Amino acid sequence: MNILSSVGSFGFLTLISRVLGYFRDILIAIFLGTSFLADAFFVAFRLPNTFRRLFAEGSFNSAFVPQYSKLDIKKKAFEFANSVFNLLIFFLFVLVCVAEVFMGGVIYIISPGFIENPEKYNLAVTLSRIAFPFLLFVSLSSFYSAILNTKGRFAVAAAAPIILNLLLIASIFYAKFFDKELVYFMAWAVTLAGILQLIMLAIYAKKYFTPKISFNFKISSEVKHFFKRLLPSIFSSGVMQINILVGTVIASFQTSAVSYLYYADRIYQLPLAITGIAIGTVILPSLSKEIFQNKDGKNFFLQNRSIELSLFLSAPATVGIIMATEPIISTLFGYGSFDQESIRQTSKALFVFGFGLPAFSLLKIYSSFYFARGNTKFPFYVSVLTVIINILISIILFNRLGFVSIALGTTISCWCAILIYQFFLLTNGMHKFDKTFIARVSKIFVCSFIMSAVLSFLLFKFQFAFEHGSIHKIFSLTVIVGISALIYFLLSILFKSFSIKDFKVKNYDTK
């Protein structure tokens, strides 16, 4: 398998989804801004969407792929997958039914501050009831994605979330054109998108797996092992999403804070699509195979190149976000109901999140190093510690910094997790930095530093352009980003801080 090609296709399609997600969010910003309607919808959307990210971008793959990859007998692999599929249907259906009945309590738990505004609280409950069945469909979609990933078919799984964003965009236009209640149509679009994603992935995975629905459960040792690993995987793979959910709980006590954090989150998620999620997802099947075959040399090579690639992509994105925070928010969201105060407050959160971008990217990759070895316990413990650190920082500093403390807690806690992961990888002989890694990472930092000087000059030259209309802002930001990125990549070629040929490795036969 060509790792770079797989990362490229997965990352590109994920990036397309994120760009469509941005377009969706700019429409929401124009029509809803940071109003109580926006807060209510974001809470309702965040609940099932958090589960989507938990399953689709980490935990299910982490528990399923290594286990499924080891079963080289076709019949045994089918029995394992079929049992998992049927159990998922049963448990998820029960979970959705229970949540629908007790949704009022669920919203009180995740957004306790909403109770002070009955209209906002009741709207959030109603919208959540409409959108929550998405969880059932997206979780089953993740099952099919995992099947496809074990066969080296990453593109379809990456393309599936595009459906969600297209339907949400369509629902916004439909509601505005026919003068309907916007937030209700958006909530229904979420559930419909889940159904369509599931149908699409089931069709593409049919070649490799067609389930036999049966509730006469046969729980083999492999199935027990899978579910034993799944819960720790959910927590450890989804630590970023859990941190965001924790942030939503705390932010609900400050007016519009949920919206500020949501919009800031959407910006750094764009580069994160490639710098962490794509690399971590693609590297897991390869690494699982090599570890199963006891090829330590190749393990270390794959791990070093994965970290390199993540830093190569996240370093310039980090510099750009930190230095151009307000121009980015103003250009991407500063229209309609999204006023100057919204721009200023959202920029504060994005600035702090920017310092955490490399850690957010590496988190997915480092946890994959453990998951590939069948170790879900250690990432689970690290994730628990990470969430505790995040909660403590967010609560302690909330009175002084407001919602910014939530961004700070997320950033610091994720960097702590990276340091812990790396320390134990080195001390347990599961990783060794090679000379190539040290040389290239040093060059990446040099290239990023030079790019920051160029970016600073460009921001100074274009500073007044962001005070004008949308055309001026979009043109100026495009020029600034384009020139800065070009300088960075030219410097990278000059200093040889990245090598494409290292990723053209045939790791295993995916057919």
Per-region residue spans from a language model:
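Membrane-embedded alpha-helical bundles of multi-pass transporters/translocases
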Residues: 1-511
